[in-house]
Amino acid sequence: EKIGSTGSGTGPANSDRAMRVLKLAKDFDSLSSLVVDVPLEINSAISANENVLIEGTQGTFLSLWHGTYPFVTSKDVTASGICADVGIGPTKVDEVIVVFKSYVTRVGTGPLDKELSLEDAEKKGWSEFGTVTGRQRRAADFDFDLARRAIMLNGATQISITKLDVLFSECEGKTSYDELSEDAKAFVKNIEDELNTPVTIIGTGPGVYDVVDRRN
């Protein structure tokens, strides 16, 4: 069964690096002016008390080490793996924010517990298409077991919830927690209680500023 790769070349590149046959950007004269010492740059910024945000890609369970193998990507995508990618040690990290969608989606093959039919997903407004592949995403209700394990694997200290407005349309564009409906607040509170982790950032729409920020 095909895994459903994006076909972007990342897997072959990671494979070549593991085999130590990959040429790096620094090996090409045309790219040499664009190459910097990323670990030095990032650690220097941290030492200077600058704010540094490191954003990872993909979902926890696409991790090569901790995901639903073999239906995974070609590297580790957990918080520890992301830090290793840019060259910072674990003691340099203050906060780990894990991002959950208000429901679960998956592109391509692989397990998806309590998966909805495409028809039911469309009725709920959960019909989505992958930004890279253009393939339709499969959907399921929020999975507390997956979320709990993601919290553990990433050492999360905060939770960000996206697409709350898809579940609760009355919350679209809201920027204050007090403006959210009681049903939406109950949904957020249940996540906090079940996962014992605060929900600090809530997405309420597609716009950059469609966000409820509960951080001090």
What are the residue ranges of the model-derived segments?
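Non-transmembrane, aqueous-exposed alpha-helical and coiled segments at domain scale
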Residues: E1-N216
